[in-house]
Design a protein with these regions (language model features):
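Catalytic-core regions of core metabolic enzymes
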Residues: 1-225
């Protein structure tokens, strides 16, 4: 250790020491907080098999690439799970992994029945979920039904709260980690509701994948104790 607090000596040496000691190394302050966030609030996964749920091909491909970069596995889904998903997914979607729903027939299924089916899959350990519920889209339905002003705000706030609660309870119910990512921005109302309930949501799928890898490493090292 140098007088500045930096590690002195070959970096590979410290990697080896950390590995033997069971230390999960964070390579930046951002990673330190990301890893602490998921390790402190999510169930320990049984393995490194990730299923990705997304509403569109782009976010799904980005997440799949990110998982590949950090050594996570994307398993095929069982026939039973595929049969569960089929009623919810339009012909334009895909029920492979990543599960690309291309918007579901009922948008609210995205936050309830679909993630439940994926977490019930025996061949997966972790759900990585693209999270999107823009305010302008959600407001359209109550406005179309004749609600105005404060009534619209009340309706949208209730919907955000209900769907966020539906997502937040899944890790405890199924004993599997659920991690989110979004390209919309963490300041959006729905994302804030998720964060308030302890759901980790990242602005970059690679950060999500690295956080998942930290969870997997922790699980592996716990098994060796």
């Amino acid at each position: 250790m140098s007088h500045t607090g930096a590690l002195a000596g070959p970096d590979l040496l410290y990697d080896g020491v950390f590995r033997q000691s069971g230390v999960i190394r964070a390579h930046s302050v951002t990673e330190l907080f990301d890893f602490s966030w998921v390790l402190g609030g999510l169930p320990t996964p049984k393995g490194n098999k990730v299923v990705i749920q997304t509403h569109s091909g782009g976010p799904g491909a980005a997440a799949a690439d990110s998982c590949g970069k950090v050594g996570l596995e994307l398993p095929a889904l069982s026939k039973k799970t595929l049969e569960k998903l089929t009623p919810f997914v339009p012909h334009t979607g895909s029920i492979n992994n990543p599960v690309d729903l291309t918007y579901t027939k009922n948008p609210l299924d995205y936050f309830s029945d679909i993630p439940k089916a994926l977490l019930e899959e025996n061949n997966t350990d972790i759900l990585l979920m693209y999270l999107l519920m823009p305010l302008h889209t959600v407001k359209f339905s109550p406005e179309h039904m004749g609600f105005r002003g404060d009534q619209v705000i009340e309706q949208t706030t209730q919907l955000f709260s209900t769907q966020a609660e539906s997502i937040a309870c899944l890790p405890e119910t199924y004993g599997k980690p659920l991690i989110g990512y979004t390209f919309r921005g963490l300041e959006e109302q729905f994302i804030r509701e998720l964060l308030k309930r302890g759901v980790p949501v990242f602005s970059d799928p690679l950060r999500s994948a690295r956080a998942i890898r930290a969870l997997v490493k922790y699980a592996d090292r716990r098994k060796k104790l």
